[in-house]
Regions:
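Short, charged recognition helix plus adjacent turn
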Residues: 1, 13, 38, 67-77
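Intrinsically disordered, low-complexity basic tails/linkers immediately adjacent to helix-turn-helix/homeobox/MYB/SANT
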Residues: 57-70
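Short, basic-rich loop-to-helix N-cap that marks the start of a DNA-contacting helix
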Residues: 43-57
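Phosphate-coordinating loops and pocket residues in cytosolic domains that bind phosphorylated ligands
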Residues: 27, 41, 68
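Short alpha-helical DNA-recognition segment
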Residues: 20-38
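Residues within the helices of the helix-turn-helix
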Residues: 12, 23, 53, 64
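A short, Lys/Arg-rich alpha-helix, primarily the initiator
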Residues: 1-21
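The alpha-helix within a helix-turn-helix
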Residues: 15, 26, 56
Length: 77
């Protein structure tokens, strides 16, 4: 699995677990609506750590909790 695919997968998992929608989590984390739209539409890759950090802040989890999945150990380049 590629890194960006793993991150998107985890974002969806967290939102489902927490009963959040993606936009709300990112807005709570301080991302602009236009950046969220570009991310959702695939115009922007979300593999920057700051993007993941903002999502985590909005979702109420830590970066450690976000990346604590086995599939992050088998990332393709």
């Amino acid at each position: 699995m590629k890194l960006n695919d793993a991150i998107v997968k985890r974002i969806h998992e967290v939102c489902e677990e927490k009963g959040l929608n993606i936009c709300d989590a990112f807005l709570k984390g301080g991302m602009s609506p236009s950046a969220i739209y570009d991310l959702i539409k695939g115009r922007t890759k979300c593999s920057k750590v700051i993007t993941v950090k903002r999502f985590c802040e909005g979702a109420g989890i830590t970066l450690k909790e976000f990346f604590d999945r086995d599939y992050f150990n088998d990332i393709e380049e």
